[in-house]
Amino acid sequence: MKTYQDWLAVADKDENTRMQFIRQLITEHKASDKYKQARDGEAYYAGQNVTIKRYQKFIYNKFGQAVPDLISANHKMATRFFYRSVMQANTVLLGNGITWDNGEGAKALGSDFDRKVMKAGRIAQVEGEAFGFFNNGKIEIYGYTEFVPLYDEEDGFLKAGARFWQIDSNKPLRVTMMELDGYTEYQYDKDHPDGFVKQEKRAYITVKYVSEELGEEIGEFRNYPTFPVVPCWANEFKKSELLPIRSTIDAFDLISCKFANNVSDAALIYWTITNAGGMDDASLAEFLDKMRKLHAANVDGDQSVQANSVDVPHESMETILDRLEKQLYKDSMALDVDQIASGAVTATQIEAAYEPLNEKLDGYEAEITDFIYRLLKVAGVEDKPTYTRSIMVNQTETINAVMNSAMVLDEDYMTEKIMTVLGDKDKVQDVLDRRAETNINRMSRGNANTQTE
C-alpha cells in the first residue's frame, strides 16, 4: 500500500519517474485485497455470485479421477439479497433528500447533491469506500475501483489520489493525478506504454474575465483550501457491507442451485427392463427413442418394462433455505417486510421490526454526515444536514396521536407532521403559504365588515 509520503518522494522528480510511479500505483491497487473485494461487491450487487460462477461440479471416472460433470444439471442462480439490502438502507435514510439548516449547503454543493450523495452511499456500502470530488460547485463521485487514495501517514487525511479509467484492455488508460495544488492528466496506450502527459498540471479553479483596458480575456487560477476529494464510508469498519454476509449468501445460493439441480435431474424418468439382458447399448438407445416418440412398448414373453422416478428430499432444503434467509436479514440488520406486510399491524410492531435497521442507519448516517461536512469544508461554507427517514407507519394511529396532541402543538407542526406521514412533505410549505394567505384574507374581510358597521 502506497501513501502520500511515497508520492512526495517522486512528486518533484521528472515526469518519467512520476508516470512510472503512477502506473505501479494503479497496478498495486488492482492487486490489493480491498480492490478485489470492491469488484466482488459490485458483482454481488448486480446479482452475480462470483463464488457460484466459479463453482464446478465433478464426477469420478472408473479410475478414480475427478473430471468435470457435463451431464447432470448445473444451474447457477444468485439471489439479489445484497442489492435489496443496500437499496433499502439508502432509500430509507436518503430517499427523502437532505434538509439544510440555513440553505448554504444546498447552494454550495449543487442542485443534484441529493442524487450524488445517494450514489456515494451506494458505492460505499458495496465497495467499502467512495470518494466525492468537489468540482467548483459540482460533485463527482468515484468508486474504489476507479480511484487510488493516498493517505497521509502522519495525520491519516487524504492528501492525493489517482483517478483512472479504461474502457477495455486494448484501449488507452487515462489517469488524472490529483494533488493539493492541482491536477495533471496522463495517458498510457500501445504507442506510449510508459505514458505521456496529456495535460500539464493546472489549478482546480479557473476564473476568467475581460480586461476593459487591454480588451482581452484574462484567467486567474486558484485551488481549494484543502484537498477537494473526500472519502465516504458506510460503517465504522470502513469495509463493504457484503463482507459479513457473503458466506451466508454463498450458502443460500449454493443450496438453491443444488435444489434446482436435484429437481431437474429427478424429473427424468428412468426405465427398468426385465429379462432383456441381451440388449446392448445401441438397442437400449433405440428403445428409449421409441418410448419418447410413441409412449408405448412391445414386450415378449416374460419381459416387462417399468417406469421409475426419484423423489427429491425438498423438505430439508426448504427448511435450511428459510433459516439462511432469516439469518441474512439478521446479520445485515435489514427489514424483512414480510413481518409487517400482512394483517393489521400496530405502530409498536412496525417500530420493533424497524429497530435493527434503524440501529444500522444510525451508524450509516454518522458516516454520511461526516462526508458532507468534509465537502462543506472544501466549499468554504457552514451548514447542518438533517434527514427524514422513509419508513412505513400505521397512518391512522400516527395521525390520531398527532390530533390528540393538538392542545400542546402548534398548527404548523401538526400540518408538517401529518403531511410527512401521508408522504407529501415536499408540499408542506405550499400548504402553509396557502393557509397563511387564507387567514390574511379572512382577517381583511373581518376588518372591512367591522368598518361598515
Which positions does each model-derived feature cover?
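Extended, regular secondary-structure scaffolds
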Residues: G121, Q125-V230
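Short amphipathic alpha-helical segments
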Residues: G105, L109-V117, P244, T248, ...
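Short N-terminal secondary-structure initiator segments
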Residues: M1-N49, F237-R246, W271-N298, D331-A341, ...
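Short glycine/proline-rich turn/loop motifs
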Residues: S85, G97, Q303-D311, T438
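Short, hydrophobic/amphipathic alpha-helical patches that form generic packing surfaces
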Residues: R84-Q88, V126-A130, R246-N262, E416
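C-terminal helix-loop subdomains that flank or include functional centers
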Residues: A285-D289, L294, N298, V312, ...
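Extended, helix-rich architectural segments
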Residues: M1-I139, E453
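Extended, charged amphipathic alpha-helical segments
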Residues: S211-V345
